[in-house]
A protein has these predicted regions:
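Beta-strand-rich domains and repeat architectures in extracellular enzymes and scaffolds
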Residues: 9-45
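Repeated scaffold domains used in trafficking and secretory/extracellular systems
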Residues: 18-23, 67-84, 133-141, 187-197, ...
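Blade-loop segments of beta-propeller domains
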Residues: 20, 45, 54-99, 128-138
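Residue-level detector of Asp-centered blade-edge/turn motifs that repeat once per structural unit
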Residues: 26-29, 87-89, 142-146, 197-200, ...
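Conserved beta-propeller blade signature
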Residues: 32-35, 92-93, 148-151, 203-206, ...
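Short, conserved, GDST-rich strand-edge loop motifs in beta-rich repeat architectures
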Residues: 37-45, 94-111, 152-165, 207-219, ...
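Loop/turn-rich, solvent-exposed surfaces of beta-rich toroidal or solenoidal domains
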Residues: 262, 274-277, 305-362
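Blade-level signature of beta-propeller repeat domains, shared across WD40, Kelch, NHL, RCC1
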Residues: 384-460
Length: 460
């Protein structure tokens, strides 16, 4: 069975798009808003609106560097929208992120911005750089009670990494005032991908430890107590990873990486959904977190279903289902990294690399049965190779942004390649990327066999 989607080639708009992680949401006006990112020093991220009823795609900002009031001929671009996109009182909120990951650009980077977008007028609001020279990697969320934004600010410059660390910041929506709530962790650099802000205004989060191991953090859950104005750490409370479909233990070596790799609030913000899959401890279940239940005993964490390995490729329809994308075979899903295998030549792919769209009920009393909506193909029968940005609504619309095999040079990504990127993918255990990503000169662009596409399907 196939799941046929309608896809749009984004590299026909900007040649430099080369990937997208997070940065997609459905809004109250029925549209899907999303970012398109690049590692090129010649262009920043773009911001789009897609209306599913008419399939109309609108470019809201071709280069977020300009929205931020910066000149990419003088400073590195704001190359990514890597954050969640959240909505409050008719506004969307998102953050920019550094994408030129080499020393000269890192040292010249101005810092990540928090951006608002008003749905009714199309007006942008720039809250400015949160902390000079620091990026936001990558969480943002809103306290709808007290009208505050929270972001996770991360150092990249060597001196800042050595002498400082990551910070939790709060922004007042009305005034734009920024408050540094403290370093998290107290020592070392951490990353945080998702927040959950509950109905009391408390901000809950974990630290993503795959890039930068933190020996002091093994399955910790953090809480900013809004009434006390203090950050609390619940040590070692995150569940130990188990594998689908029968609960076999995840590899012991992954235990130190336990963290939320995806999280979304349930209606009313009393609870949230979360996963701790690929690069997050290896757990293969969908969970509900309820902060009103006992955290230390584990009672606050309730498993819903075994879904298999996932990373960012999940979407909650804000009603009763979670959609997710993964390889057909569960063992392949936990073994192969699509961010790497998307650049493999076909003869080096010795597994079924067809991605499937699946879904599961969010009802804890349901049977946890997975619906496989089929192999994802588009209207022109392209092959899809990576999805790490998704959204869904309660009308059966599912939206995806990812990498597909290009059928022409116009569809292909003109991607920026530098040695540290190749080293990173090789160190992860995927040296075959060198066959397609190798370039004769370091720091240069290369036309790839894949391109970036936005895709939409209605599952109802």
């Amino acid at each position: 069975m196939d799941c046929t989607v309608h896809s749009i080639a984004l590299n026909k708009i900007v040649k430099y798009f080369d990937g997208q992680w997070q940065g997609m949401a459905t809004a109250s006006d029925g549209a899907c808003y999303f970012g398109a990112s690049t590692h090129s020093p010649l262009h920043g991220a773009s911001f789009f609106k897609f209306e599913p009823a008419t399939r109309k795609l609108t470019i809201l900002a071709e280069d977020m560097t300009e929205v931020c009031g910066e000149d990419r001929s003088r400073t590195p671009p704001q190359g990514k929208i890597h954050s969640p996109i959240i909505e409050c009182d008719g506004w969307l909120y998102l953050t920019t992120h550094l994408s030129n990951y080499w020393e000269k650009a890192i040292n010249a980077y101005t810092g990540a911005h928090v951006i608002g977008y008003e749905l009714s007028t199309g007006r942008f609001r720039d809250f400015g750089v949160v902390r000079e020279g620091y990026s936001i990697y990558s969480a943002i969320d809103v306290d709808r009670i007290n009208k505050k934004l929270y972001v996770f600010v991360v150092p990249w410059r060597s001196a800042d990494v050595e002498n400082d660390g990551s910070h939790l910041y709060q922004l007042d929506i009305a005034t734009g005032a920024k408050a540094d709530l403290g370093r998290v962790p107290p020592k070392g650099r951490g990353a945080c991908i998702w927040f959950f802000i509950d109905n009391k205004g408390d901000c809950w989060f974990t630290l993503w430890k795959h890039h930068w191991p933190l020996p002091s953090d093994e399955g910790d859950l953090y809480q900013f107590d809004a009434r006390a104005g203090a950050i609390r750490c619940h040590k070692g409370v995150l569940p130990i990873g188990l594998l689908a479909p029968d609960g076999a233990p995840a590899p012991e070596r992954l235990r130190c990486e336990r963290s939320w790799t995806w999280a979304q609030p349930l209606p009313g913000n009393k609870q949230c959904l979360f996963t701790m899959g690929w690069l997050g401890g290896g757990d293969e279940r969908l969970w509900i977190f309820d902060p009103d239940r006992d955290i230390e005993s584990g009672d606050a964490f309730q498993p819903i279903a075994y879904i298999g390995a996932t990373f960012h490729s999940l979407a909650y329809d804000k009603k009763d289902r979670v959609y997710f994308v993964q390889f057909r075979d569960l063992n392949d899903a936990r073994t192969h990294y699509s961010e790497a295998t998307r650049d493999y030549v076909r003869e080096d792919i010795h597994f079924n690399d067809q991605l499937h769209l699946r879904s599961v009920s969010t009802d804890p009393d349901a049977d946890g049965r997975i619906l496989d909506h089929g192999r994802i193909v588009d209207q022109d029968n392209r092959h899809i190779s990576m999805i790490e940005s998704m959204a869904a609504d309660d009308k059966g619309n599912v939206f995806m942004h990812g990498s597909w095999h290009a059928q022409s040079p116009e569809e292909a990504s003109y991607a920026y390649v530098w040695q540290e990127l190749l080293d990173y993918l090789t160190d992860l255990g995927f040296p075959n990327v060198l066959k397609t990503l190798h370039v004769a000169q370091d720091h240069t662009h290369k036309l790839l066999h894949r391109g970036q596409f936005f895709s939409h399907a209605n599952i109802s």
